UniProtKB/Swiss-Prot annotation:
Belongs to the UPF0200 family. GO terms for molecular function: ATP binding. Pfam families: AAA_17. ATP binds at residues 7-14. InterPro entries: NTP_hydrolase-rel, P-loop_NTPase. Keywords: ATP-binding, Nucleotide-binding. This is UPF0200 protein PF1294.
Amino acid sequence: MILLLTGMPGSGKGVVAREFEKRGIPVVSMGDAIREEAEKRGIPKTPEGLKEVSLKVREELGPGAVAILTVPKVRKLLELNPVVVVEGVRSPYEVEEFRKEFKNEEIKVVAIHSSPKSRFQRLLKRQRSDDPKTWEEFVERDRKELNFGIGEVIALADYIIVNECGFDQLKANIEKLISMIFDGKI
């Protein structure tokens, strides 16, 4: 089984991915695929450099490019693990690419949802170089993500984890999802 994690920036995808890893479930990061590609091409791993690489690979491989870059890692991990998590799926084209490449695998989309206010506060605390510093920048970034297609992926998710009530509740929601997976209920 492949779980495709999606969610708006600051929703908690990385936190959820780390919780899966703590339970021995391997995680492949779509963002890492872009960072690795930047390194191969000798492009700095700055926000501008990563955006440049993202655009170039999409020009070369099509709109599902980042998924294409992660397929070899996912395939290798599936040889040894019953479940693999892919963190950071952002477009319907990427979901379609995984479905095309892994026809014999069960694929589920898991969306992490948080309110805009909660996400903005998390991004301010996180302080990554590419995180918005103002509400206006945050709204613009959300608009770009939605134009990219992430809203459609979230809307069509098989399972939604709400991340509003603190870390303990988030962990409980993740535990519930993992139990459902291994009990064959998802």
